[in-house]
Amino acid sequence: KAGYALSGFLFRLLLVFDRRHHTRSVQHLLHAGIAKDKAQARRLTVASYLEFSKLLVEIVKMDQLYDPAKIRVVGSQAAIDISLSQEHDNKPVIIATAHYGNWEVAGTAYAEKSRIPMTSFMRPFSNPLIGKMILDHRAGDMHKLVDKREGIRPILRAISQNRITTMLIDQHAGANEGITCEFFGHPACVHMTPALLHLK
């Protein structure tokens, strides 16, 4: 609780001084139609920043608080049976997911629950100090992290080793990395990599 309080205070300060991201968040919420007006968009922006502050604390404290026995996988029983099976018909599994919940801890938790090693592909953090702090606490023997700038070879290597391959695909892709489709009623460039790997 003390960690949440301290990080919440620091992130509120960040929100005050980081006007560029504050303004961009409000604009995106309004553009997507999630917020009905600027006042609601600002409230959602503050709430989002505070959730990020909690996530950072949870990652830093993961070594002390993480308990595999408390992890459970939810969803349809058929999906659970398939996802937690070690067989998978000898086919590699590709997970395309988004930034929701504590996605940093979720990769490790899922790999340990399924007992199948996972490789997650990520883009580098804009702040290298925060990035190092997060990476030092979230990677383990069952969960390997790979910088997406390394290209396609690490992905193919992970697939050939029957590791679970995970990609976060809810961020705007570059013009040479994605294809345009509708997202929240607006055109967005989405990543093609998971679909191309599946077809391969």
Residue ranges and their predicted role:
Residues D89-R149, H172-F184:
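Catalytic core of membrane glycerolipid acyltransferases/transacylases, capturing the structured
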Residues P117, E150-K200:
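Membrane-associated lipid acylation/remodeling enzymes share a hydrophobic transmembrane-juxtamembrane segment
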Residues A39-Q40, F121, K148, H191:
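Residue-level detector of family-conserved "landmark" positions at structurally sensitive sites
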Residues R24, V105, M133, R153, ...:
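Short Gly/charged-rich anion-binding patches and loops
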Residues K1-T97, N102, G131-D136, M142:
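Membrane-anchoring hydrophobic helices of lipid-metabolizing enzymes
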Residues T23-R24, P124-P128, P187-H191:
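Active-site metal-coordination segments of metallo-dependent hydrolases
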Residues Q86, A111, R138, A158, ...:
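A generic structural signal for well-ordered alpha-helical segments
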Residues I59-K61, A139-H143, T166-Q171, A188:
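Short, structured secondary-structure boundary patches
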